[in-house]
Amino acid sequence: MSPPSANAAAHPQPLTAPQAWAMLLALVSGFALSQAFRTITAIMATGLQAEFGLSAQALGVFAGTFAFAFGTMQLFMGIAIDFWGIRRTLLVAFPMAIAGAALSAVATGYSMLLLGQVLIGVGCAPAFLVCTVFIARYFAPSRFAAVSGAAMGVGGLGMLFTGTPLAWLVEQSSWRWGFGVLAGLAALAWALIFWKVREPQAAHAGTATHATPESLGQTVRGFGALFLLPHTVGILLLALMTYASMLSLRGLWLGPLLIDRHGYTLVASGHVATAMSLVSLFSPAFFGRMDPGPGTRRRWLTGFTVLMAALFAAMGVWQLAWLDVAGPLAVGVLSGYMVLQYADVRSSYPAAMTGRAMSVFTMALFLGVALMQWITGVAASTAKAQGAEPYAVVMFTIAGMLALGAAAFRWLPAPRQQV
């Protein structure tokens, strides 16, 4: 985002702690719905394949469309937050997610499903970005990782819905009811944000320390300046792989893997998805509190990424029922380390670039999800055509992409000085 946000972040009008937490929780309700929307495919996959005859590759495109729309909108949402503020940006964008869910519930073909995913992705695009900007503005810098971890944990409640509850709903009715219920919940979240979130007057562009807000051209050039810094590439290459690995498993492949490999029912696979989501609720807050600081944080990020790659590789090598349950649970526990990436981004750039850096980083996270879900869909379809076990190939693909991300982060230039 543009420099006015950075100035407002440094000198916003104060909120009391109860006010700040109440507003953050309202914003997190939108993030929770975003979490739910991005993890529906694992539970809806069998119903969608049965009704529309989707291949594994088409299923990967369906799941990745949300992430692609979400990711490509991050820069635009960042600019919107600068110029119009957190509240107005989210209130204008989020109704598109409601419309997309409603459209998906009545979809008559694959193209309508994809359009619904685009609308949902665009509508949810500012959901977590507004939370990180709000935390940067109204909480102390020393608490950024811990508060972000808590927000990610609470927002993860959305993934609990897309476990056992959604599996039961889909099994008792259809996947269409799943989209319908999510549309209703999203409308309630929008109403809560409208009611609770009120930004102080000086919290966005035009009322901050700059008398005149930046032009659009200046803002775009400001984003370009990020890529002139050599350490940006390594940060973004790791960002493309980490969250994508967790979401490709939880949001796309977990249900089909358990059903096809081990004969699980839809509700039984939903139980595993719920358990994975449950442990992932607490993991970000734990890792946020354990943040070792700039001196050690990058080594932790590399090490945990390699460990995550090893878990996926193990699920590819040993096709055992207990491992295919324990592995996702372990991934859910370890996924909390990704909150340290936000702290790493915040400490890797000067204050005037922090907002822009967060926008670009979040964009990379979700473009990575779209990329990995598409690549693993292609890998699964190719493996099936060649007579190979598709889920082993999917797990190896994810492991390899994680290893590449860790290598890039480790060997490409690091920030000269972190703050």
Predicted regions and their residues:
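Cytoplasmic helix-loop-helix junction between adjacent transmembrane helices
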Residues: 116-155
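Helix-to-loop junctions at the C-terminal end of transmembrane segments
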Residues: 73-85, 283-296, 380
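Juxtamembrane intracellular "pre-TM" segments in multi-pass secondary transporters
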Residues: 8-16, 200-236
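Extracytoplasmic gate region of multi-pass secondary transporters
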Residues: 41-42, 229-284, 372-377
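Helix-breaking motifs and short loop linkers at transmembrane-helix boundaries and internal kinks
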Residues: 53, 85, 106-112, 123, ...
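Conserved MFS/SLC helix-loop-helix module at the cytosolic interface between two early adjacent transmembrane helices
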Residues: 72-111
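Cytoplasmic membrane-interface "Motif A"-like loop-to-helix N-cap segments
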Residues: 83-94, 292-305
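Helix-loop-helix hairpin linking two adjacent transmembrane segments in secondary transporters
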Residues: 150-202
